[in-house]
Amino acid sequence: MRVIARIASASAVLLSAAAFAQTEQPGPSIMYKNLEYRFGVIFPNQVQPMVRDTTYTTKDGATVPARQFYLERPGEWYTVTMVRLPNGPPIDKAHVDRTAEQILKKGTAQFNYSYCYDPGIPGRQLNMREPNGNQLRASMYMWDNRLYIAEASAPVGTHDALQFEQSITILDPMGNDLDNGQGSPACP
């Protein structure tokens, strides 16, 4: 009888632990896709982002219009800024590097990596500590005269910020991911 009681107790503990673990796991992620601006990203809690017009200063000092998709919550924010740069080459790593230089001014870099999103698509990823203690995760890429800048500022270790920054996806005009699974070789 004691064996049965112990098995029943152990089963109850295991089932409770399993139920608790399930409640602690993030739910399914649904990517927000914007076909007009050709990107996708996972915003926290599947919210539709707010949209605002902004400007971007190019590597040559010109100010050009940009569109920003964003979510702000107490103590954290998430943005994707998309800049169209039609008067230059379709891919210009100098724009990516200049963007990284500007973001690096916001805090202390803990990770600064240059690589390709996919062959021929230059990119950078940054992981920084901001003066307010938040972690700033950023990635930037250029493709087809479009500069994509994803930034997430949140308390250190926030799952939503990591998922947001890592989920940025460049889309073709039909909404398909440009990442063809060929790996991410170093960019020249």
PLM regions: where:
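A short acidic-to-branched-hydrophobic micro-motif
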Residues: 66-95, 149
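Envelope-exposed proteins and targeting segments
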Residues: 28, 37-39, 43-45, 76-78, ...
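Signature of long, low-cysteine stretches enriched in small and polar/charged residues
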Residues: 40-69, 97-143
